[in-house]
Amino acid sequence: VCSSDLKIRSFVHGGAQERSRRAGTENIPGIVGLGAAVERAMRIMDTKTRKEIELRDYLIGRLENEIPHCWLNGHRTKRLPNNINFSFLFIEGESMLIMLDMKGICASSGSACTSGSLDPSHVLLAIGLKHEEAHGSLRLTLSEESTKEEMDIVAEEVKKIVQRLRDMSPLYEDFLKSQKNN
């Protein structure tokens, strides 16, 4: 919606269609096709979303129950249906990412807009995580093609990798010693 006084220059020249703003005949088959595609997408979107939420929550549950000293970042349910972000104490996210990549598992340690950066996620810092907590973060993104079997593989590999990295961590060793002394 714009003022009738506003002068809009045509970006496709050659005719007076569309009040001289766009020359040519509308692509009716394309318009109908787009409408049909949108209708189909709307019909299956709820099913896809429910599946992603089910898989997301399943993987969250496995990670929380099977790996000590980790937590879900962000709200449990008010999040994208395909997004998981965890922090793991006593490890560096970059090391975890390299090891996951070697297993064929795609992940990131920050937001999609900062992938490739070695700095901790500014979003995680903004929601109150400490620098070292944000550095030990892992972001996983599911898709409509993700399966429960893949979630099991991811959970098992993350569990093994976290344990292997903690076994090498002097911070984790100090933590375990302090727990024995208490």
PLM ranges: what are they?
Residues S115, D119-N182:
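PLP-dependent enzyme catalytic core of the Aspartate aminotransferase-like
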Residues D46-E52, P68-H75, G110, L165-D174:
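Flexible, glycine/charged-enriched surface loops at secondary-structure junctions
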Residues V1-S3:
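Short, small-residue-biased leader/transition segments that mark boundaries at the very start
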Residues I28-I31, R56, I60, P81, ...:
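A general structural signal for well-ordered alpha-helical segments in protein cores
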Residues Q17-A41, K48-L55:
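PLP-dependent aminotransferase class I/II
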Residues L63, P68-M99:
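Anionic-ligand binding region
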Residues V38-G61, W71-L80:
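Structural signature of PLP-dependent enzymes
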Residues I84-R139:
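Conserved C-terminal alpha-helix-loop-beta "cap" of PLP-dependent enzymes
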